[in-house]
A protein has these predicted regions:
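Extracytosolic ligand-binding ectodomains
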Residues: 1-152
Length: 152
């Protein structure tokens, strides 16, 4: 990317942090040297740590059942199904009303739902939200060989 190349050239010894788009994670044309030198960060709804025992166990079970390794949709489906099952067991059919009070840590990330109001009339929130949205997001930084969660 010309932008990163030019920024690296003009930054000199100054410390710079660049916040990019989640799509940058899959750009093979971006040199790792630029990502490191410019302290590139991106946001992501998901991050899989393949060294975690729970991720390895799911991969093994999925492979034994299907003969192939799970893709991103497989991990997402597992997390959503497990979360929904736990909510049903704990709250029964009334679980949708409890979504915003529960946090679930899945293989790909957390589920932290919050109500979203789209009404244009202020104070017209008579407990009727328009929908729930997962507010959790990973902030990833480039560290030598790939993107990792900030703090690791």
């Amino acid at each position: 990317m010309a932008f990163l190349r030019n920024l690296k050239a003009v930054k000199g010894s100054s410390r710079v942090e660049v916040y990019g788009m989640p799509q940058w994670r899959n750009f093979e044309a971006i040199e790792p040297e630029y990502l490191t030198a410019l302290n590139v960060h991106i946001s992501s709804a998901a991050y899989l740590d393949y060294s975690m025992p729970s991720v390895k166990a799911f991969q093994q079970a999925f492979y034994e059942a299907t003969g192939t390794l799970p893709d991103e949709d497989g991990f997402n489906g597992y997390d959503i199904t497990l979360f929904t099952g736990k909510m049903l067991r704990q709250f029964g059919l009334s679980f949708p009303g409890r979504l915003s009070s529960q946090v679930f840590r899945g293989l790909r990330g957390d589920l932290r739902f919050a109500p979203v109001y789209t009404t244009t009339v202020p104070d017209d929130r008579s407990n009727q939200y328009d929908y729930l949205e997962n507010m959790f997001v990973h902030i990833l930084k480039f560290d030598k060989y790939g993107f990792v969660p900030v703090g690791n």
